[in-house]
């Protein structure tokens, strides 16, 4: 497997102000094989970025000995695909159509997508959507994106996040299968499920549907967002995860998504990723 760094682990990454070249330089210096870039409606990489800009990023990545492991976005948190307001849903679908093209231009084939939310734990002002309504709107939204993803050869990789939606591996599996497309899969985050389940079970159940892996660690005894800790300091059983990944023949990217940025966190993360996976 190839170890990858999320653009968001570096200072200014989550805010979208860190130059991509600087993030790639840091990832290269820390010994990562790849970097997962972040895309937003504003910042250094957006859905309006041009092919020429993407070509330049890709060329620079190769010069630094890096691959681009995927593209991630948090736009669905503020413009939810399952919002009551149709204009909000149209806004995020338009953004995602364009972001899928940017993903292809960047030479990678996985786009991290949050399909909607029943609620948003870090935005108490956000509306609460009934689960069944959320489910139908999420299906409708992704259905409108599938043909674009297939034409571009990019996968819509649905991440399991703290959105009170798609709460079990069986439900995630069946939701993905609904679209009957090789270009819809999972961006599986091992830390995000630890509070309510076992990552290794999710991996075996999702199997080949997994397009990419996110690596985090979490302490169940804390049980809130404060439970996300540095790698090897929580309760994630990385040996069990590696065994499960081997069983499904996954040998792709494992991306450290350690947020928010803290001093020394990128260095600690790189060392831990090498210890776990190298």
Which residue stretches match the model-derived regions?
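Histidine-acidic metal/acid-base catalytic patches
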Residues: 1-3, 7-33, 62, 143, ...
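N-terminal pre-domain/capping segments
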Residues: 1-108, 143, 181, 267-278
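Residue-level preference for long, well-ordered alpha-helices that form the structural scaffold
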Residues: 16, 50-53, 85-92, 127-134, ...
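Active-site acidic/histidine proton-transfer and metal-coordination neighborhood
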Residues: 17, 21, 25, 60-67, ...
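Acidic-residue sensor for enzyme active/binding pockets
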Residues: 36, 159, 257
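Active-site loop/turn elements of alpha/beta-hydrolase fold enzymes
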Residues: 37-40, 73, 113-116, 161, ...
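Positions that flank functional sites
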Residues: 42-43, 76, 118, 164, ...
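A short acidic, helix-capping loop that chelates divalent metal ions and anchors anionic groups
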Residues: 43-45, 77-83, 119-124, 195-196, ...
